[in-house]
Amino acid sequence: MLRKIGIDAIEVRKVQQLSEIDGLIIPGGESTTIVKLLTRFEFVDHLREKVNSGMALWGTCAGMIVIARELADPYPIPLNLIDISVARNYFGRQVDSFEAELHIEGINGDPMRAVFIRAPIVQTVGEGVKQIASTDDGQAVAVKKGRVLATSFHPELTGDTRLHTLFLKLAKEAQEDPRQNSSTAGNPSST
């Protein structure tokens, strides 16, 4: 999806690679495993530093869980990179996966098809965090603050590049103006 819109994407596997990028996507998967790997390979403090100094960050599904301030579950301990509280697997198990049409603030045109697979939900948003999409019953499924974006669905599964284009804009802003990112929750070291 990223190459489709002209992004020269790399897989970040070493902490030193963070210095080469203006934006990072933490994808779906298993949030506990993602946090364990980020911790084991000493990404956590470096990632916080990069986000605090303006790097764009996007957490999708499990990535949203990873970057949240707080979870309804005791594990994993999230990284506190955006001031939201999240409930894991809100819509149920794998068999309960579904698709929905969403109107996303900042995305023009028709509603965007969103794929929810064991998806989390945003329960609360902190000061300055903007809810940019919700389900028909009002559940927040996409939020943004500064250059940090979090979505509970998998936009990479639909072929629609509009949300990726929005993220590209955030990464370009980071490249052009790497000032402090206004996205982070309180004190990240408190997690």
Spans of features found by a protein language model:
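Hydrophobic anchor at the start of a short beta-strand
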Residues: 9-10, 57, 148
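Amide-donor transfer/coupling interface in amidating biosynthetic enzymes
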Residues: 88-191
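Redox-cofactor binding/interface segments in oxidoreductases and associated redox assembly factors
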Residues: 26, 59, 151
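Short secondary-structure boundary/hinge segments and terminal tails
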Residues: 19-21, 68, 106
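Cysteine-nucleophile active-site neighborhood
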Residues: 30-103
